[in-house]
Amino acid sequence: MYSAHCMLPELRLYQLISPSLPVGGFTYSQGLEWAIDKGWVTTATELENWLKSQMLESLTCLELPVLVRIQGYLAANDYAQAQAWCNYLAASRETKELRLEEHQRGIAFVRLLPKLGIALTSELTTMVKTSQLAAFALGINQWQIPLDKALGGYLWSWLENAVVVGIKLVPLGQSAGQQLLMSLAENIPAAVEKALLITDQEVGSFTPAQVMASCRHEHQYTRLFRS
């Protein structure tokens, strides 16, 4: 039997991953702007390879498993462990630019979450400022979003923002961007499945080209995206 109540968590997820969410996700390129400027990424195929590598070697092995742990510890009211994983995520950001993005988006969530009905204690505020993933985890718990759907939604949100960067800078046409989304999104189900199986000892990322590009982007003379 159809139930509007059952649909509400999914609708809340759509809101949480929307590009219109005022937390600045669309203002960062995570090094991609420099990679495009220096000719590392010049075609739709090269962009697809770049994003696929980042998705499978970073988000699947670092962000998603950390999000799973933060969500679980917050649900259990174990704030110490949740904060520890926020700290781990922040420490895993290998450039100043990536650390600032994590912190700045966290601050934006601190302003936003109370307006969406999520109360923040001083402990939770510190957590969210450390890592935006804490804000996402709070949303998952508050709105009872199924974890696998939340992980897929998080990946989709990142992917959509990254493809928009490519559309603007490579540049690519809008249709080519949609084709990229169609192709790359096919990796999301397997990525979520893998992320849910990763042990604590396996959590980490390895994307040296992206890290180098992010370092260089901090000093790029002309930029459209924040550093």
Curated annotation (Swiss-Prot):
Belongs to the UreF family. GO terms for cellular component: cytoplasm. HAMAP family: UreF (MF_01385). InterPro entries: UreF (IPR002639), UreF_sf (IPR038277). UreD, UreF and UreG form a complex that acts as a GTP-hydrolysis-dependent molecular chaperone, activating the urease apoprotein by helping to assemble the nickel containing metallocenter of UreC. The UreE protein probably delivers the nickel. GO terms for molecular function: nickel cation binding. This is Urease accessory protein UreF. Keywords: Chaperone, Cytoplasm, Nickel insertion. Required for maturation of urease via the functional incorporation of the urease nickel metallocenter.
